[in-house]
Regions:
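Short, well-ordered beta-strand elements
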Residues: 34-44, 88, 98-100, 120-124, ...
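Alpha-helical secondary-structure segments
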Residues: 39, 116-125, 157-163, 167, ...
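N-terminal lobe/hinge region of extracytoplasmic solute-binding protein
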Residues: 41-94, 125, 207-213
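Detector for C-terminal structural segments
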Residues: 59, 220, 316-346, 379-391, ...
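Gly/Pro-rich hinge or "lid" segments in bacterial periplasmic/extracellular proteins
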Residues: 76, 178-237, 355-356, 360
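Aromatic- and charge-enriched surface segment that lines or borders ligand/interaction sites
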Residues: 89-134, 155, 161-163, 253-256, ...
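Surface-exposed binding/hinge segments that line
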Residues: 102, 139-192
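Ligand-site clamp/hinge motif
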Residues: 202, 229-275, 391, 400-402
Length: 535
């Protein structure tokens, strides 16, 4: 979220590879994992399948990113650019709808089967035809069951053609094709395992069919995931084995890290992170994530529909105080709808707690003494704690905020039905393209109850024909520079006038043992890479 690409590149270089923020040499003997093995404590309870055409959770996406290849991957140092994965080169036709990819030579799957253009085309066709959750990502470029066989096809053994339903920004198309639903699977292997026309989905739930740097050795549900280096991979890999262990308790992760039983801990509390950095048992690296925590104000509530009230609420949050005392280092203040690391991100946080200014705005809105309103709150950290702090902030201007607790399913269902007053929750991007968030916060083509497009603006009944037009225009803009400028203009508009109080951006903090380097943690789990790991 920087105004210049040079400063953005500097930030993302720091983000993409975990480096030490704080470290002191260890002063006592400790156990250690083998030199060529990397052991990490994390949360594995989201796993229900290993099929990239079915996975739609965070850590499973990370697994897919390291076991499978795709055509391209976004360049984290400059999100307007892309690096070839199995694609050696690519081009776009004059109409802007035909994308031709030329593949590298001598690619092979873990099975030993040759990886050809037919595998690439079949993998994308398979994901669309299975029609699981990830198919929605590919639908973003117009691929559906009716057209995917025609629009995704091999031209020869080394060339694939993908045609979109209309002209999109090339950066958008490449972001979609560089995401996990477009992972390349071993067609020959999966057809041999196919049952009842399932494209091998039943078998792939517990096996793998990839060509990435690591292959699956063993998955024990709720316990561990073991990966082995693929010695036929095109790039050198230092780590022979990667072990992910399910350790739900932060305190246990800390003890394992301090004792040398693991090389990295992904889920330590802020206090634990500070402690292990101070005592020299670990190095802590922070990586901004593409997850925004925000308030949604339902404009069906006539009071919340008033622009002065919406602005007043933005001045009635003690952002810095909540960060300092509640979320600490796990979130940071962020008030625009594009997270750090996205094309066109805008670094602007103008709002702070200003009760006098908020009261003046409420008076202009006709509610000088405040009003009563409810907030649906997920009964989990940090949502409850943040909501309670905001409740106290609002009270300073006479606003009586009643908190309605519920589990995530309950609060989200009410939000999606537009039955809330205020909703506190988060929004995570599926892929690192600005449209992923602009579509949520600044796009509402049909505000009716029967709309087929029920994104965040719709959920808050915010009718925005002009912003919707701008979002559609940015989606089709071929120039990355002009596209970035369009998203910056939209962010300024939403920041100034919208029913969204965007509060914080999530920050992933990884604690690694001294001597560990190269764990690349991007803004989404799909961009976590083990390729450069060293000890």
């Amino acid at each position: 979220m920087k105004p210049s690409m040079s400063s953005l590149a500097a930030l993302l270089a720091a983000v993409s590879t975990c480096f030490a923020l704080a470290a002191v040499p260890a002063v006592e003997a400790r156990a250690a994992t083998p030199k060529d093995m990397f052991v990490m404590a994390t949360l594995l309870d989201e796993f229900s399948t290993l099929d990239p055409a079915e996975v739609y959770e965070l850590v499973p996406e990370e697994y897919i990113a390291n076991v499978y290849d795709r055509l391209v991957r976004v360049n984290l140092a400059d999100p307007s650019k892309f690096d070839g994965d199995i694609a050696q080169s690519w081009s776009v036709d004059a109409e802007g709808t035909g994308f031709t990819f030329r593949m590298r030579d001598d690619l092979r799957f873990h099975s030993g089967n040759a990886l050809t253009a037919e595998d690439v085309a079949w993998s994308i066709q398979r994901a669309v035809l299975l029609d699981k959750g990830p198919a929605a990502v590919l639908a973003g470029i117009g691929l559906n069951k009716a057209n995917v066989m025609q629009n995704v096809r091999k031209l020869d053994d080394h060339t694939v053609m993908i045609r979109t339903d209309r002209k999109y920004a090339p950066t958008f198309v490449l972001n979609v094709l560089g995401s996990w639903p477009a992972s390349v699977v071993d067609r020959t292997l999966l057809l041999a395992q196919q049952q009842n026309g399932d494209y091998g989905n039943g078998w792939l739930k517990t096996h793998e069919a990839g060509s990435g740097g690591y292959r699956l050795v063993k998955w024990t549900a709720g316990d561990s995931l073991v990966l082995q280096r693929f010695d036929g991979y095109r790039l050198p890999l230092a780590m022979k084995r990667i072990v992910l262990r399910h350790v739900p308790e932060a305190a246990t992760q800390r003890l394992m890290l301090e004792s040398g039983d693991i090389d990295a801990a992904r889920d330590l509390s802020p206090d634990d992170l500070a402690a292990v950095a101070k005592n020299g048992k670990a190095r802590v690296a922070a990586s901004p994530q593409a997850t925004l925590l925000y308030l949604g104000l339902n404009t069906r509530n006539p009071t919340l529909a008033r622009p002065q009230v919406q602005e007043a609420l933005k001045w009635l949050v003690d952002y810095q105080g909540i960060q300092r005392n509640v979320v600490k280092t796990t979130y940071r203040v962020h008030q625009t709808f594009l997270p750090d690391g996205f094309l066109g991100t805008l670094d602007s946080n103008p709002y702070h707690l200003d009760v006098a200014r908020a009261k003046a705005l409420l008076a202009k809105a006709g509610v000088p003494n405040g009003f009563a309103v409810t907030m649906d709150v997920r009964n989990d950290y940090p949502y409850t704690e943040i909501a309670q702090a905001i409740q106290a902030n609002f009270a300073q201007a006479g606003i009586k905020l009643t908190l309605i607790p519920g589990d995530n399913k309950q609060t989200l269902a009410k939000y999606r039905a537009r039955q809330h007053d205020i909703y506190i929750g988060d929004w995570s991007a599926d892929y690192i393209d600005p449209h992923s968030n602009a579509q949520g916060f600044a796009w509402n083509p049909d505000n009716s109850d029967n709309s087929s497009f029920k994104m965040l603006a719709w959920r808050n009944a915010w009718n925005i024909p002009e912003l919707t037009r701008q979002t559609d225009a940015a989606l089709a803009e071929p120039s990355p520079t002009r596209r970035a400028q369009q998203y910056q203009a939209m962010q300024k508009a939403v920041l100034a006038n919208s029913p969204f109080v965007i509060l914080f951006e999530k920050v992933a903090q990884v604690a690694t043992a001294p001597g560990v380097s190269g764990l690349a943690v991007g803004p989404i789990n799909d961009l976590v890479s083990y390729r450069q790991l060293k000890k």
